[in-house]
Every structure is written in C-alpha cells, then in structure tokens.
Amino acid sequence: MKTIKSNIVKAALGLAVVVSPTFFSSCDDMLDLVPQGTFTDAQLDSTTIEGLLTSAYAGLECHFFGNNESFQGPITNWIFDVRSDDAYKGGGSLSMESNIHDLEVSNLRSDNVCVRDKWRNNFYAIDRVHKAMRAIEGSNVANRESMLGELKTLRAYFYFDLIRVFKNIPYFDETVDDPSSVSPYQYSRDDIFGFIKQDLREAYLAMPEKQQDKGRFNKYVAAAVMAKVCAFTASVNNSQQDWNDVVTYADYVIGSGQYELYPNFLDMSKVEFDNTYESILAIQFAATADNAHYNYPNMLNCTISEGNLYGNGDDFFLGSQNLVNAFRTNDAGLPYLSGNSGDVDNNVNVTGDYQGNVDPRLDFTVGRIGFPFRGHTYTSSWCRAYDIYGEYSGKKGQLAPEDPNMVPGIVPWGASGLNFCLIRYADILLLKAEALIETNKDLGKARELINDVRDKAKRSIDGAYSPVDLDPMRASYKVEPYPAEGWTQDYARRAVRMERRLELAMEGNRWFDLVRWGTVVDVVNKYMQNESSLRTYYEGASMSDDDVYFPIPLDEVDNAANGTYDEPKQ
C-alpha cells in the first residue's frame, strides 16, 4: 500500500520543480511571503498537483533551512516540554544549545533563535500550503475538494501551533497577495481561533472517511485537531460550548472505528506500527538513501552509550526528576495526586534503586540506570552530563540501534525513519474525558475512558516484549484503574490531568496543557524553586505571566515597515 511517507520521498527525489527556488532563498523576512512559483494550466497535471500536496505535508518536518532550525523550532515541541516541569535541556553543558537553556530557566528574549525558528518554520509551512491551494483551486483535478480539505487541516494545525506559542501572529489565507502587509495585531486571538475552526469544519465535511495512502489526512484527522483546538479555547475561555464541541469531535474519531489503543505501550516506538492503531496525525519520517527525511527534530535527543555501543549521542531532552516522581503509584496502583495539574511534591525521588511501586510507563518514557534501554542495559556512562542533567534520557522517538529503520552513518546515531505522532488516540480519549469532567455531565464515562488508557499501561508489563524496555524482576510495577468510590468532579479533574502527564510525557503536550489550565506560572515556579536545591542553574530562575507566550521574533520587528506594528486589537 502507498503511504504519504513514500510520496514525500518521491517528491524530494523527483519533483523539486514543485517548490520555487526562491522559497528556500528568501529567508530575510518571514512575513515577506509574496506568492512565488506560479504554474500554467499545462503544468497543472495530476502529478504536479500531487507533488505540491506532498510538499505541503513535508512542511511538518520543519526542514526548510538545516538541521539546527529543525531542532530548535520543531513542531514536535520538545523544547516546550523543557519549558515545563517535565524535562531538562540536556546535552554536554549548560552552554550547549544555550538558547534552549534560556527557555528552560525562563530567560525569554525576542532574539532567541528558538523564537525565530518556531515562527519561520510554521510560516514557511503555511506558504507551502498556500502554494498548493492556489494551484488546486485553479485546476480541475480529481478529488479537488478533498485535497483542499487536507490542506485546510494542515493550515489549521500550523496556525494552531503558532497561536499556542505566540501571543500575536499575522493571519492570512491563500487569497492574500502580500502577507507582509498583514500586521500581527490585525486579528484578535479569538478571531484567529475562529479561522482555524472554520478551516477544520470545512475540512471535515470535504474529506473522505478513509484515504488510500496511509498517513494522508481523512476527515477524522480534522476532527481530532478540532478536539485539540476546542480543548484549548474551552480551558482558556471557560467555554461550555467548546467543551461540548470537544466531546462531539472526539466522538467522531472514536466512532469511526479506525483507531484503537496500542496493544503495548512500546508499540508507539516501533516503525512497524507507524500509521496504525493510535496514530491519527503524524510526521512522516523516513530512512532514505538521500538522508533527506529522517527525524531531524529528535535526532540529537539520543543517549550516549558505554563503549560507543550506540555511536555518538548528544543526549539532549532528559526527563526531569519531577516527571519521574509523578510515575510513583500507591498500594492501590494509583498515582499520588498531590497537585491540581499533575504536579507532584518532591519528597520522594524515584531512582534506579527505588523500591516502591511505579507505573510501567516510566520505563517506556525514560532510561534508568540498571534498566533495559531498547534491549541493552542502561548505565551511568551513557549519560553525557550526569552531574548537570541526571540520568533520565528520553526513550520515546528512539529506536534500537539494530533496527533496520535507523539511518546508517549519521552522527549522532539517533537518525531514523520512525514517525512522530502529533495527535494519537489516547490523547483524544483523555480530552473527551476532560470535557465530560469539566461539564460535569458524565463522570462515570470519563472514568471509563481514563481507565481504558490505564489498562493499556497495565497490559504492557511484559518483560519479554522486544526490544526489552522494562524489568518486572527489578521494579515493582503497579497500575490499576480508578474505582468508582470517591470519584468526584474535583478528584476526576486531578486524575485526568495527571493521566495526560503520564501517558503523553515528553511528547510535546505538557506545557500547552499547563497554559490552557491557567496553572503554568504557579506550577513552573514551584518546580524551579524545588529544582534549585538539586541543580544550581535553577537558582534565581522564575517565570511571570509575561513569559508564557513567545514575543514576536526580533528579526520580524526589525523587518516590519518602519520597525513598528500597529497597536494590538483589543
């Protein structure tokens, strides 16, 4: 069966004509995206149209300039987990990737390259979408409306990613001839969320239930993105209607019968399970001969290893001690719900020799000294800067070195063709559960959905499942479903927030959950204060309300007309 992944590879090898060369050279002003590379009617054949569509999908890779820009401003949003209480920057020193270090300690500046790269990666991706839209709108290609639905879903996702990160952004569609004329303050945030939702409504109606190519968007991808968007606006605006919409669109996904939870938690880190089970919206990475489409955003986040077993690794993106502690469970197999946002007290630290109960998802998420790591034994010598960042190298997104989907000859060793799920089925189940809890409509159903996710974790306790990633003989794994007794709205809210933290840990969700819940400043400040006793680089670090959203990149302000923008729309 064809996949959109194979189409992306073919487009890169044989359809370079579909993207204008000026697209790659015009880097000075990310708002200066005047339409380039128009096509004549004779050029608009089905092959060219497919190439443009595929190029738009490839925008999810965020590989427009080079590997550094993909790493520093990825749509995987790992750098935002570093901004939260879930992760440390990692690497060999504090100064290595210093711009990400600044984000970790909340030293937020408009000239930070992560701010710049996040902005321009998304806007260049949107430009690709608009190129494809203009071509398709002017053609008579078969499945025209469905293709436009795919592109509207992509555009909605890119704008959603931007509006979650930046407080003010310019919004323009494919009909705008000169995007540089659009001020970041022309539309309010509510306006932009409205545009995003309208794209997704239209996309849902236009796309089929199934696509021939695996990984290509169907109507349920649009529904899943809509559920994510509505959960954000529901939380921020305390909107009961938006919570109702979360349930509606989550039910579209659930009722489709096309998605289910992975049989084993480890399956999300296996290429053979790409575009199956939980995968709803994924970046389609590939191990190819030209090394053009491997997992640029994550490749540096691989552990170093004893005796160079894995080859050189940069060991960025390590789980925090606070995150690891969150995986503790009590005698009933339930997490310790000490906070209202999945945050925990650091009174007990889980380490490799910890004797208490833990959720098995801990050892699928991070490496622990003495425990299996993709079939090998993880030791302290695998930690590049143990004294600074500790031991908890991330596992999600990393294959075993023997896996045939690794890209050989790349340093560091982490380059592979493993997809990265931006939205997976467990996320949608938990969003529906959260919506039912917030509206107080069906707490029992919410508990059932949360327990479905916990049951997957329980059945994943299999010490023989390959490649081996946990050790039931060494750790006391215990995870159980929530009982009906004591299941109040307040308790259920704390439970679903903790479940999102545990299930989706180090997948780029935690920061945005804290933002939409309105707890990010309190949670991160408490976290930084606790961390300062363990890691001196947190001493004096703090976050204010002004630090939540990225500022407009300094380059964009400098390049704007007269160096200023119009006053914000209230």
Kindly label every feature range from the protein language model.
Residues 46, 50-54, 58-63, 92-166, ...:
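Conserved, well-structured interaction surfaces
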Residues 3, 19-48, 196, 227, ...:
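Bacterial Sec-dependent N-terminal signal peptides
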Residues 26-78, 334, 555, 559-570:
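Membrane-proximal, proline-rich intrinsically disordered regions
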Residues 33, 87, 93-95, 109, ...:
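Long, intrinsically disordered, low-complexity segments
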